[in-house]
Regions:
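C-terminal lobe and pocket-closing loops
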Residues: 114, 200-268, 297-300
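Cleavable N-terminal signal peptides
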Residues: 6-7, 17
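A ligand-binding cleft/hinge motif common to bilobed small-molecule-binding domains
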Residues: 87-97, 161-165, 192-226
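Hinge/capping helix and adjacent helix->loop/strand transition within the periplasmic-binding protein
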Residues: 73-79, 93-180, 229, 242-275
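An extracytoplasmic/periplasmic, membrane-proximal ligand-sensing/linker region
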Residues: 164-165, 205, 231, 253-314
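N-terminal (or domain-start) structured segment
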Residues: 18-105, 143, 167-194, 203, ...
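Beta->alpha turn/N-cap motifs
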Residues: 83-88, 148, 178, 195-200, ...
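N-terminal signal peptide c-region/cleavage motif recognized by signal peptidases
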Residues: 12-18
Length: 314
């Protein structure tokens, strides 16, 4: 691709006007998870097509607020983007006052993926189905530990749904991230985890973890043999976390539209989409307008659940 053509196709990233400064995709989480994986696929696609550097910058902390605020307060010049999970927009605003307003200070670009979550237990726990787990939890109220990567995290909300629908009481142990929690899960120090399939697949396949149910409305392409929560007897249980691409508020609509189209083209390429699906990442894209409506609706839905459950910030 010639430089002129690359500039025309990837004008959204403004790679040509500022070739000396790499564009960046900020991920408000540590490397290795689904958001980081998607950001790197996107960055590689943009860089390969344009010939200009695109870097992924991991800025974890503050329940994903630190990296998200960084982007919210960046110049609206089309050089800085945020690839973030749903809780930044749907959950965090209901848990306390942040130094920025994600719904006002960040502009939706496109939905990028749904992340397949799975309910797992360590192989040392003598349950082989969601029904058996519920029965065990009922016989030992408050004795089974579940982990999460923090108050209001998808893992926390997933376990709360399990408690409410299963009619059980579990003991919550929040961690600073998923990695230390999964390490304790493998060691049997916590007994229940509802988390992203891609980070759990190796442990499920080598028999260290047992998958009891997936949390979306349909079975996982990566774990087709595992029933959905509804199929496993947890009727009404559905947790379908998403990831999206955002820009600082004030970025030109034309730039946002072009970036959304570029991201959709890269992530929906058959090879990339299949590789991500094998990791439990279901690529889904949208227009900026569709995504903006979706974000507002999801914020309202989780706000009701959080208020009803009485969840408070740490």
């Amino acid at each position: 691709m010639t430089r002129l053509l690359a500039c025309a196709v990837f004008a959204a990233f403004q790679l040509c006007a500022h070739a000396q400064a790499p564009a960046r995709i900020v991920v408000p989480l540590t490397p290795g998870g689904s958001p980081d994986t998607l950001a790197r696929v996107l960055a590689q696609g943009l860089q390969a097509a344009s010939g200009q550097p695109v870097v992924v910058e991991n800025r974890p902390g503050g329940n994903q607020n630190i990296g998200s605020e960084l982007v919210a307060k960046s110049a609206p010049d089309g050089r800085t983007w945020l690839l973030a999970p749903d809780n930044v927009f749907a959950v965090n605003p209901h848990l306390g006052k942040a130094a920025f307003d994600p719904l006002a200070d960040l502009a939706p670009v496109t939905l990028v993926a749904r992340i397949e979550f799975v309910l797992v237990v360590p192989q040392s726990l003598s349950v082989r189905s969601a029904g058996e787990l519920v029965a065990l939890a009922k016989s030992k109220p408050g004795e089974l530990n579940y982990g999460s990567s923090g108050i209001g995290s998808p893992q926390h909300l997933g376990a709360l749904l399990l408690e409410r629908i299963g009619g059980v009481k579990l003991n919550h142990i929040p961690y600073k991230g998923a990695a230390p929690a999964v390490a304790d899960l493998l060691g049997g120090r916590i007994q229940v985890w509802v988390g992203a399939a891609n980070s759990l697949l190796p442990h499920i396949r080598d028999g260290k973890l047992r998958a009891l149910a997936t949390t979306a409305g349909k079975r996982s392409g990566a774990l087709p043999e595992v029933p959905t929560a509804a199929e496993a007897g947890l009727r009404g249980y559905e947790l379908d976390p998403w990831l999206g691409l955002f820009a600082p508020a004030g970025v030109a609509a034309e730039t946002i539209n072009r970036m959304g189209a570029d991201a959709a083209r890269i992530l929906n390429a058959p090879q990339a989409k299949a590789r991500l699906a094998a990791q439990g990442i279901d690529v889904q894209t949208s227009t900026p307008q569709e995504f903006a409506r979706f974000v507002r609706d999801d914020n309202a839905r989780w706000g009701e659940i959080i208020r009803s459950a009485g969840i408070k910030a740490e």
